[in-house]
Amino acid sequence: MAAAAVAAAAAAAAAASLQVLEMESMETAAAGSAGLAAEVRGSGTVDFGPGPGISAMEASGGDPGPEAEDFECSSHCSELSWRQNEQRRQGLFCDITLCFGGAGGREFRAHRSVLAAATEYFTPLLSGQFSESRSGRVEMRKWSSEPGPEPDTVEAVIEYMYTGRIRVSTGSVHEVLELADRFLLIRLKEFCGEFLKKKLHLSNCVAIHSLAHMYTLSQLALKAADMIRRNFHKVIQDEEFYTLPFHLIRDWLSDLEITVDSEEVLFETVLKWVQRNAEERERYFEELFKLLRLSQMKPTYLTRHVKPERLVANNEVCVKLVADAVERHALRAENIQSGTCQHPTSHVSLLPRYGQNMDVIMVIGGVSEGGDYLSECVGYFVDEDRWVNLPHIHNHLDGHAVAVTESYVYVAGSMEPGFAKTVERYNPNLNTWEHVCSLMTRKHSFGLTEVKGKLYSIGGHGNFSPGFKDVTVYNPELDKWHNLESAPKILRDVKALAIEDRFVYIAARTPVDRDTEDGLKAVITCYDTETRQWQDVESLPLIDNYCFFQMSVVNSNFYQTASCCPKSYCLENEEAVRKIASQVSDEILESLPPEVLSIEGAAICYYKDDVFIIGGWKNSDDIDKQYRKEAYRYCAERKRWMLLPPMPQPRCRATACHVRIPYRYLHGTQRYPMPQNLMWQKDRIRQMQEIHRHALNMRRVPSSQIEC
């Protein structure tokens, strides 16, 4: 009633205003007629102004204005859509009902004209050809989850169809994507794909990849697939992987690029997937088993684990595949013994997957003949007993430290002043080097080891310093170093072992006030990274061959000038303390050629329980210095040392470490360019040498003239 009264009053006021305007117009017209009559009586002629089609402005010589203008209100559409949405909320003028079987059984009222204009999904549905158009009800059934989408999500998507606005979160994006796909809201669907791209992570890449396939988001599927492919060995540890349907499992096993640790792991993955729903999935086992590369499995594993497996033993095709693989291994072993071992076959099914992680002993930096710094990295490919080229580092490294983490290889420091603070890390998955935050001090010959995901830099010395006591820690997430409390004494030529992800055992040298050859004394100490306390001990814990070897040579010049890759052990510190001993057996040195221990500047590292000695030099005199390319391996299984194929070129003061690199970067012959910064520096050195040589020649000319 109040609204009607207000409307009547507004209409009366408008009518009164119109009456006043009409009276004023009539008075003006009467006055004009009287003036015109007087003018006619006075002159006998009348000037009617410009002729037809000529405006007053044109007659007076001015610019004519437009006869018509367009008006557009930019906010009108948004205000209109907002008002329509408000009407929908209030149930005004609604002529269609959306009924969701899920969503708590809720019904949502709307306007069919708006829905039909918003998406092609509703245009044919509400145009009269279907019963929904006549009944005014649209039943929405068959959702991905039993309850259906949440009511709040449905409301948000309907509001988007009215206003073009919506808020999507990680909790709602799946349902929004499903609704957008059902209602053919292409732009909203694309937005959900971009949103999921930003949220893609190792923990959700399997689920997002499945969503991308389900809703045909090709770009999102490619990005998620690439993440899964490069981290497949981690993805298969997630229980969500074992919920995937057969066709996706088959696709992944067919992929040559998946990163895996071994084919044995893939066999166990197939078994685990089948056993999750044996009644339904056993029929797929044979097809999946054919996709495994049995020739890449160890013979003992084939005979002890694969062959006795029930799913294999009860399938004739699988039994034959295992027998063929065992026979190939036997022929290969026979060829090796007879000395007729041929090059690895090129048949793709007999080679490792390109993404399979292979064991490599990586050699980094160092100095070669003539004092040339080496940026080239090389690797000893363990399975194929050969050396391969790896990417160049961007620094001149000499006396640097190395540490291996789960994802990277870090190198830091150098005797070369221009690179003494630099830190680089190698990513095996990408086969690339990248710079990270530099050290806080220029130094070399220090210890570098990982504890709980952080790198600890301990001791070292510089070109003009007797040594350092400093302890700094690097946080990879922040890409930043910060100082901790210093060690109680100077520590140089540091070698480190980490125990229990807390304690760092260190073998080093420290300056002493006594008459010795170099004024240094060997020390062994333990650093607690939690309490930051130091304690001297008698020896490194004698845990494995790597520890025994180091303690056997700890007082030798061979060990003190060598670099040693740090190693981490999972055993508790109490057990490690019990393995400390004052007397150490040198049995591990029995089969090592005696001349090896006279080498200086070698690189020492480990692989499982084996020990490697690589490169170095003989004779400290610069004139007679002999750079070495030999490499030795202590085989724990055979309990003896073996001479490996020589490195491509001799080098000393390098570092070495064990790293797992995908086969795609190891097969064939690789060539990598030298980094631009080192090429420029090399050219500059060459130019300086030419200038120096020219200057010497110029000096010789006058002196020869004087002598004449």
Swiss-Prot record:
Top-rank taxon: Eukaryota
Membrane-spanning parts: none
Keyword Protein transport attributed: no
CDD domains (alphabetical): BACK_KLHL11 (cd18451), BTB_POZ_KLHL11 (cd18241)
GO CC terms, sorted: Cul3-RING ubiquitin ligase complex; cytoplasm; cytosol
Residue numbers spanned by region Disordered: 47-70
Location of the BACK domain: 205-307
Kelch repeats: 360-407, 408-453, 455-501, 503-556, 610-661
Signal peptide: 1-15
Keyword list, A-Z: Kelch repeat, Phosphoprotein, Repeat, Signal, Ubl conjugation pathway
GO molecular function: ubiquitin-like ligase-substrate adaptor activity
PROSITE patterns according to UniProt: BTB (PS50097)
GO biological process: proteasome-mediated ubiquitin-dependent protein catabolic process
Phosphoserine carried by residues: S465
Function summary: Component of a cullin-RING-based BCR (BTB-CUL3-RBX1) E3 ubiquitin-protein ligase complex that mediates the ubiquitination of target proteins, leading most often to their proteasomal degradation.
Subunit structure: Component of a cullin-RING-based BCR (BTB-CUL3-RBX1) E3 ubiquitin-protein ligase complex. Homodimer. Interacts with CUL3.
PANTHER family tied to this protein: KELCH-LIKE PROTEIN 32 (PTHR45632:SF3), LD33804P (PTHR45632)
Protein's name in the database: Kelch-like protein 11
Organism of origin: Homo sapiens
Encoding gene per record: KLHL11
